[in-house]
Amino acid sequence: MKRRTLGPLLAAATLSAALAQTQAPPASAPATQTPPAAPAPAQPAAPAAPRTAPLPAANYVALGNFYYGRGNFDQAYVAFRAAAEIDARSSDALLGLGRSQVKLRLYAPAIETLRRLTTQDPRNLSGHLALAQAYQQQFIGAGDRASVTGNLAQALGVLTQAEALAQASPEAERKLNLSKVWNERGNVLRLQGAAGQAIEAFKRASTLNPDNGLILFNLGDMYYATGNLVAAIDSLQRAVITDPADAYNRAYYAKLLAISGNTAAAKPEAAQAARLAPNNPYAVGQYGVVSYLSRDPVTARAQLTQAVRLDPLRYPEFYYFLGRLDLDAGDLKAARENLTRAVALGSTTAEWIYYLGLSYERGAGAIAPDRLKARENYERALKLNPDYALAREGLTRVR
């Protein structure tokens, strides 16, 4: 994104509408009238142009929060940056700017912004949590994770500082603040591969804040990642009960039900999640996944196609299931394309790489088999999971 120089009148036209929903801007200086040079009633002199008072940083922060809440992160970034230029010591401006930069995948600038915030306002708990999240997102988004391996240790260090701040917060807020720290710590531990410690962190967060759907989602996700499907379903069911309008929780709950074999219960839950948030790619895509697992390829393809249209990069799983649909239909060209996208965006999943290999092993019509590429992908899958029987059988076939 190009750097923009922002003056105090930036987005003035937008402010008049958007700030009306947040807070009113200060009144402009009254217009002054220049008296006529000589009596001429038929030709009054035009009024002088009014002087517009500069808008304070707080107005831009309010505008940024308005846009951020609507998911308009580009516009939020512009507003928060204007606020930070007007008042470089505004913690609210720096926090909003850093969070917006993370959403726009500007990870290095986000870390710099949030470090500045936590340096000048060391007791800002939200700033510490946002900085820990920025370190994680830079790690997740890195093409070469070896270059950012220190990020997770830095995130844990920031969270240690955040925990001290949370412990010192007023008693009425302490449990809530500590739950945020432990939830974030669980996220970092998950990225480090410390599954058991991550589960304990999420459990501790949930004990502190038992009615928080996000924490229950994260706990259920870790249970699923470690093979405890029953506990995962229980945690997601609690999340849905806690917040019935949350499409993410309901969509994931539906997927876990389908994986357990209970597709009859899963399908209506998935459909409800997509109805709750028709523009949410996760909810729409998981309806597609559940439909695939329920042997409804028509609905599956429609929902998965819509999901990747809504967000082409965030959910490689949906390309994987589109590839599976293509394989089932014998469309090898489309299968290879979708499975290649899935693997490119999420290349640590052995199952996806195996099915990419299978698409190259097969041939149909003008699409010839490519045994060399099939072998390469089977070998990659086995490196990730040496006990993956399907990949071993595939490798035996193409040798």
Name every feature range the model reports, one short phrase each.
Residues 62, 96, 130, 177, ...:
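Canonical tetratricopeptide repeat
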Residues 54, 88, 122, 167, ...:
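Short coil turns that delineate tetratricopeptide repeat
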Residues 71-82, 103-116, 140-161, 191-204, ...:
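Structural signature of tandem alpha-helical TPR/SEL1-like repeats
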Residues 57-58, 91-92, 125-126, 170-172, ...:
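Helix-start (N-cap) detector for alpha-helical repeat units in TPR-like alpha-solenoids
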Residues 55-86, 103, 180, 184-192:
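Alpha-helical segment of the N-proximal tetratricopeptide repeat
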Residues 47-52, 126, 161-179, 308:
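Flexible helix-coil transition and linker loops at the boundaries of alpha-helical arrays
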